[in-house]
Amino acid sequence: MEISSLKELYSGLNKHIDTVFVVPLIRFDFPKTDYLYLLYEDLIDENKVKIESISVFAHFRFVLHVFFNRNTLLHYHWLEFQDVKSILGMPYKLICIGLYKLFGGDIVWTVHNLKPHDKKYLSLHLRIHRWMARLASIIHVHSEASVSLVSSTYDIPPGKIAVLKHPDFPAKLVPQETARNEFLSLYGDGRKELKSPVFLVFGGISEYKGIREIIELLSKQKPEFTLIIAGYVKKGQESLHNFIIEQTIDDSRVLYVPAFIPEEHYPLLLNASDICIFNYDEILSSGGIKMAQSYNKKIIAPYAGDLRELKNDRMVSLFNSKEELQTSIISTLSHYSNG
């Protein structure tokens, strides 16, 4: 079933809900780039339902709350662990979620990925996710394309899954030349220009984004271009970080910015680019692609998950293999070379 708002989704479970607990924490300081803030923005502004953003350590709060007040709801996003430290905290999370359900609380679970990006502990993740899928009152996904994938993976009926589109990111459009000059003044490392076409890979630096392959494919090309790789290096991704430095340090066509990009600089980054490349090895939904669309960027991305719905979008080029990715890159370079 497709719905138009979280309010509609929640009302279908309980018309008298007065408190929604959200996990993980909403980053209220990033109202233009934080997915969770944008998803709950209407409810936050309306202020009729209290939105309680909860950390891992504060899970006990929603358990205590539902014990005294049934007009509450738990909206959980993701449910993953990446290392020993986070796996040790998982039993506490699961106990709190289980007790909350036992005491009569309703759960909405938003599925963002069928597998963790780092693909660690896959069988354990699958068992936990199937348990969560059974426990949830409603499972939320961002596209019709995800319904069958989530239903078959977690062995649940499609009727338990609600579709609410990914929130849009507000865009601040700036003339490209202005954006490039300002971006270079902040991150250019002495550069005076960005030669078109400007390819962009942005967000946290991580292996699942296929950055190694993008570098290898572009480095073989002769036409001029610029590749910007911008974002903070995620925990455990030092090997990838070192690879990028080693492969690009002598290539003036690549600008590597391994740093957190402040929200106010995203308009410069997006407006300065021509094409955003997303080389995910596996994906269900992507906030990065939604942001690129907000800035009217051309997009190269895999034919997977929610992205399959973009197959007829003239601004999007979808690929099924490394060869098709290479073809898209060469076609883009040829287009710019020929004016």
For every predicted segment, state its role.
Residues 134-151, 156-175:
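Donor nucleotide-sugar binding/catalytic pocket of nucleotide-sugar-dependent glycosyltransferases
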Residues 241-263:
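Nucleotide-activated donor-binding/catalytic signature segment of Leloir-type glycosyltransferases, i.e.
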Residues 315-324, 332-337:
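Conserved acidic donor-binding segment of nucleotide-sugar-dependent glycosyltransferases
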Residues 202, 226-241, 259:
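Glycosyltransferase donor-sugar binding loop
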Residues 268-284, 294-297:
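Acidic donor-binding loop of glycosyltransferase active sites
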